[in-house]
């Protein structure tokens, strides 16, 4: 192995490090400690990702289903409403359209960011240092994929140490990531776990027993009326009483109407109980940091390894990062409407919201997103330069005003000293 370095050259490799967290499902809660609320995965991955699954694939709905423009919340709500009728058919339809990162029927969100390329050709080991409350808080992962999955209830800082292969002859790289379990978006975090209840109808006052019996008799009469309407004629028994047909028909119509009105409040709770509950939103929190590991003047053998394993280039536009480009386009339309002030609702959410650990939202991992980030940094640099120039001008004006004030004070002191000398003819003692 050659110990020579390639002089005057640097090579870099993009990586993603961060975490993905989801609330525990009822099945996962059985195996987790009672106080744990979330399942999270911390990992070091390649920046390139497979296309994210479409919203229709995640929800199990048909490809023609429509959701709220630019919102993943609509897809999740559709998933909660369509998961119960036929889970087998929904799973079959989803498996045909979802990518390999979501190949499981439950759509494992923990595999949906990065990890398209195998990075074990230049990373030998990744060490994760968890909170001390976990058993064996220092975890070493010696093979691809480099990730740790655990459950917990709190957020804490995780130390990530990356060890490179022997050919690199480089020291380990230490990174820090703050585990994120709860969303940054306040409008999404405020969504309740249950659907909004309809306004409660005004309940009538309790009826006396006589009215209850009248209601029961009206229901029976209504049943007799419907039977006679179908053409079935009932014969009166020997103990039956003859009633005026005109009066009986009027009474039947009135009592049947009352029964329908009184039965309306009773039917509403039945409909409300059959409606499936919506899950807590959002079900996934992506907190990832894009970074590039730079190797200045690498070893010749290591440079050959990196050259023979080039990283997969990122998509040109953000829409190509999703399996359903229409979902991203609808988000852009909703975002443009919100910027113009046409929308009065909450700000639109990308189909798969990704955040940096600082809470900054970016749409996808693409060259378009990189250019947008570069433009944002350039605008911030220009704004900082403008503020610096403005502050410099204010400082120059303040220094000039201070100099003028000092000159004025000195002139006043000299004038006062001259007047005192002229009056007394002696110099006043220095104070």
From Swiss-Prot:
PROSITE patterns attached here?
Answer: YEATS
- Biological process GO terms, please? chromatin remodeling; DNA repair; regulation of transcription by RNA polymerase II
Tell me yes or no: is Cytoplasm among this UniProt entry's keywords. Answer: yes
Which residues lie in Polar residues bias regions? 213-233
Top-level taxonomic group: Eukaryota
Q: Where is the composition biased (Pro residues)?
A: 195-209
| Region named Disordered | 80-113, 193-274
Which residue spans adopt a coiled-coil conformation according to this UniProt entry?
383-419
Gene Ontology MF terms in the entry:
histone binding
What are the protein's UniProt keywords? Activator, Chromatin regulator, Coiled coil, Cytoplasm, DNA damage, DNA repair, Nucleus, Transcription, Transcription regulation
Oligomeric state and partners?
Component of the SWR1 chromatin-remodeling complex and of the NuA4 histone acetyltransferase complex.
Q: What function does the entry list? A: Component of the SWR1 complex which mediates the ATP-dependent exchange of histone H2A for the H2A variant HZT1 leading to transcriptional regulation of selected genes by chromatin remodeling. Component of the NuA4 histone acetyltransferase complex which is involved in transcriptional activation of selected genes principally by acetylation of nucleosomal histones H4 and H2A. The NuA4 complex is also involved in DNA repair. Yaf9 may also be required for viability in conditions in which the structural integrity of the spindle is compromised.
Q: What family is it from? A: Belongs to the YAF9 family.
Q: What is this protein called?
A: Protein AF-9 homolog
């Amino acid at each position: 192995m050659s110990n020579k370095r390639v002089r005057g050259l640097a090579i870099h490799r993009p990586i993603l490090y961060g975490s993905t967290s989801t609330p525990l499902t009822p099945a996962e809660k059985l195996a987790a400690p009672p106080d744990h609320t979330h399942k999270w995965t911390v990992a070091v991955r390649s920046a390139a990702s497979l296309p994210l699954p479409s919203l229709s694939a995640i929800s199990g709905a048909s490809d023609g289903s429509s959701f709220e423009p630019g919102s993943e919340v609509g897809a999740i709500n559709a998933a909660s409403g369509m998961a119960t009728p036929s889970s087998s058919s929904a799973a079959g339809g989803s498996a045909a359209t979802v990518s390999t990162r979501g190949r499981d029927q439950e759509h494992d969100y923990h595999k949906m960011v990065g990890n398209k390329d195998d990075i074990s050709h230049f990373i030998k080991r990744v060490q994760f240092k968890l909170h001390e409350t976990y058993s064996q808080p220092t975890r070493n992962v010696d093979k691809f994929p480099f990730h740790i999955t655990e459950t917990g209830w709190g957020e804490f800082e995780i130390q990530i140490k990356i060890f490179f292969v022997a050919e690199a002859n480089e020291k380990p790289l230490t990174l820090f990531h703050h585990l994120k379990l709860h969303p940054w978006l306040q409008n999404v975090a405020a969504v309740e776990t249950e659907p909004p209840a309809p306004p409660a109808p005004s309940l009538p006052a309790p009826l006396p027993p006589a009215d209850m019996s009248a209601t029961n008799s009206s229901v029976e009469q209504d049943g007799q009326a419907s039977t006679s309407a179908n053409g079935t004629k009932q014969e009166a028994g020997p103990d039956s009483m003859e009633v005026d047909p005109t009066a009986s028909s009027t009474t039947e119509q009135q009592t049947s109407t009352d029964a329908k009105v009184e039965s309306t409040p009773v039917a509403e709770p039945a409909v409300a109980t059959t409606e499936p509950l919506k899950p807590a939103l959002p079900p996934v929190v992506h907190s990832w940091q894009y970074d590039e590991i730079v190797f200045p003047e690498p070893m010749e053998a290591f440079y050959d390894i990196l050259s023979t394993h080039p990283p997969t280039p990122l998509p040109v536009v953000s829409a190509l990062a999703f399996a359903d480009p229409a979902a991203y386009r609808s988000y852009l339309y909703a975002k443009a409407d919100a910027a113009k002030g046409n929308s009065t609702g909450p700000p639109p959410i990308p189909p798969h919201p990704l955040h940096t650990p600082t809470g900054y939202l970016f749409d996808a991992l693409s060259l378009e997103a990189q250019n947008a980030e570069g433009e944002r940094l350039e605008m911030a640099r220009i704004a900082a330069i403008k503020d610096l120039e403005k502050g410099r001008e204010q400082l120059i004006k303040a220094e000039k005003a201070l100099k003028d004030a000092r000159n004025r004070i000195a002139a006043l002191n000299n004038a006062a000293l001259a007047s005192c000398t002229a009056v007394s003819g002696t110099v006043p003692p220095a104070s």
